[in-house]
């Protein structure tokens, strides 16, 4: 979206532009919920940009609105921050959202905190391949056995496993994927 910015808006013009993006985001989410009333939830990503961190009041109110419109809606911990910029868990240690989305390209080492919590592990086939990567030379690529091991381990800890694929602009997959 051309109105999105990673840094926090500073000028009146930037704030106006980013507010346009926030309105667009809200309308898109509401449209999805209207068009797909049987949907179960949203999977979000990107709570590290300063613009989103500073929008904690917007995201708090939007989450509240989405839940009022669709009781039982499942929202992951990457949707919003608290007012102090804390992600996944607020400043009081409470999880933001319905399940923990902090396991990106890695699995939990200490599993004691998982007891009774829903979580997911988001994995790429190359080390950091979000989206299409033309050149994979010199990169370790996870094997089928690696992926199956991660899937089985995630499930053994009652986690969900999300595997990212990066097709090119024509929808074709890299041979290694």
Task: Describe the predicted segments one by one.
Residues 1-177:
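Mature catalytic domains of secreted/periplasmic carbohydrate-active enzymes
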């Amino acid at each position: 979206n051309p109105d999105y910015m990673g840094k926090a808006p500073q000028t009146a013009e930037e704030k106006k532009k980013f507010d346009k993006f926030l309105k667009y985001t809200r309308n898109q989410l509401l449209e999805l919920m209207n068009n797909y009333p049987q949907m179960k939830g949203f999977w979000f990503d990107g709570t590290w940009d300063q613009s989103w961190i500073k929008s904690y009041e917007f995201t708090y109110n939007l989450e509240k609105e989405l839940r009022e419109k669709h009781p039982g809606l499942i929202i992951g911990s990457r949707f919003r921050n608290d007012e102090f910029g804390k992600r996944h868990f607020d400043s009081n240690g409470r999880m933001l959202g319905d399940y923990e989305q902090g396991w990106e390209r890695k699995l939990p080492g200490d599993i004691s905190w998982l007891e009774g919590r829903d979580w997911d592990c988001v994995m790429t086939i190359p080390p950091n391949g979000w989206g299409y990567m033309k050149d994979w030379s010199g990169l370790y690529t996870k094997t089928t056995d690696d992926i199956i091991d991660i899937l089985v381990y995630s499930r053994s800890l009652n986690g969900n496993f999300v595997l990212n694929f990066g097709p090119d602009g024509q929808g074709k997959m890299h041979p290694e994927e």
